[in-house]
């Protein structure tokens, strides 16, 4: 199977990267995400998991006829480390290069002013570490009323690092009617409960 179910602009960006065949996690996750289903994916690093959630989300945003006139964030991706946030942000920028989608990476290594300006002016996609995002949300930054997709990446690592309370606090700020995607190398009931 190829990436034919994705919007043509996203297909073009994928072709530019040289990928021609979906990995097993992509084969299973992409169709479900495109249909709007919540997904819990068990996948190790290096299996194409980032593309498994970013590609269908970008495709859905690109196909959406709703203009993001309110400049509310439509996608929130939470990851445990600034390195992973930066990597996901780069992947999103690569796959979204033929779209007009706006993204920001939120973590401690980026200046406050740049992050706050982008959050307050509105971006389509936020990729963030939980602690840094919670700090900014508690200071009144970020608009989540139009949020459509929540992704928790490497949820097992976030549990190990003690981020679960921060994630629960952030999730209380989000609309209940959203698509929730959780990816983890392992699964347990505490991790699974994060999507609810």
Task: Please annotate each region the language model reported.
Residues 43-47:
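The conserved Walker
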Residues 143-196:
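Post-DEXD/H (motif II) to motif III coupling segment of the RecA-like Helicase ATP-binding lobe
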Residues 3, 7-12, 16-19, 68-138, ...:
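Conserved nucleic-acid-binding Ia/Ib motif block in the N-terminal RecA-like helicase ATPase lobe
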Residues 27-39, 50-68, 86, 91-95, ...:
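Walker A/P-loop NTP-binding motif
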Residues 26, 49, 74, 82-83, ...:
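Short, cationic motifs built from Arg/Lys/His that form the positively charged side of catalytic pockets
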Residues 1-42, 153:
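Conserved pre-motif I regulatory segment
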Residues 40-42, 76, 181:
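Short hydrophobic/aromatic beta-strand immediately N-terminal to the Walker A/P-loop
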């Amino acid at each position: 199977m190829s990436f034919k179910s994705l919007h043509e602009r996203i297909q073009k960006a994928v072709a530019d990267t040289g990928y021609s065949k979906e990995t097993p996690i992509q084969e299973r996750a992409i169709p479900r995400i495109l249909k709007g289903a919540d997904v819990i994916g068990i996948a190790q690093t290096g299996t194409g998991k980032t593309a498994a959630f970013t590609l269908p989300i970008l495709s859905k945003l690109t196909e959406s006829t709703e203009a993001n006139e309110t400049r509310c964030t439509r996608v929130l991706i939470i990851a445990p480390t600034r390195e992973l946030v930066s990597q996901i942000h780069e992947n999103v920028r690569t796959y979204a290069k033929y779209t007009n989608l706006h993204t920001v990476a939120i973590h401690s290594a980026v200046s406050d002013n740049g992050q706050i300006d982008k959050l307050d002016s509105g971006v389509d996609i936020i990729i963030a570490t939980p602690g840094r995002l919670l700090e900014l949300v508690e200071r009144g930054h970020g608009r989540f009323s139009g949020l459509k997709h929540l992704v928790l990446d490497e949820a097992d690592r976030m549990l190990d690092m003690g981020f679960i309370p921060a994630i629960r606090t952030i999730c209380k700020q989000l609309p209940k009617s959203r698509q929730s995607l959780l990816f983890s190398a392992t699964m347990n009931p505490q991790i699974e409960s994060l999507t609810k």
